[in-house]
Amino acid sequence: MALITYRPFVRADLPRIRDLDRTERIDVLYIQHGTQLEERRGNFDSPNWLAEGTGEHSYAAYQAHLDELLASGAFALGAFDGDRLAGVGVLVQHLRRGIAQLAWLHVSNGYRASGIGKRLSDDLDRIATEGGDSEIVVSATPSQNTVRFYMARGYRPMAEPFPELFELEPEDIHLHKML
C-alpha cells in the first residue's frame, strides 16, 4: 500500500468504483429494536458487487446511485492509493434542518483497519459541522464490523429512524451522533 491521498471524489471518478472490493466475512449481524441491538450469530460471506448487469448489487447500480447523490449536491471524498480507489465517503448536508447524512462510506477489502474509514468519517464530520449541521445520521450495514466502526466513532442507535431512510434500508442499523 502506497501513501494514501485524500481528495474530492467527483463524477469523473465514478468508474473507479470498480476498484472497490466489498467482500467480507460476517459472523455476527445486528437487528435493531429502537436503541437496542440484538446480536445474531451467522455464517455469511458478503460477495463482491456484480461486474455485469444493472441489478441491485451490481457495480453499475452503485455507480448510478453515487452519480445521483453527486448530481443532487452531495459531497464525496475519496481515498486513493495511487490511481486506485481505496475508499470513498459521501455526505449529504442538511438532510433535515441541522442534520447531515453520511450517505455512503466504503473502504475496500485489503484497506480496512488501516485508518482510511476513520479519516474519511472524521473529514466528513468536519465538513458537515463547517456547513452548519450539528448532528449526523447513517444507515449502517448490520454487520458487526460496520456497527462497531460507527459506535467507535460516537454513533448510537436512533430510537426512531427517519422514515425515508428506514424505507430505503429497513434491515440496516440506523445510527446518529451529535457533531
Per-region residue spans from a language model:
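Conserved catalytic-core motifs of GNAT/GCN5-like acyltransferases
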Residues: 58, 137-141, 156-173
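Conserved acetyl-CoA-binding loop-helix of GNAT-fold acetyltransferases
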Residues: 107, 113-128, 151-152
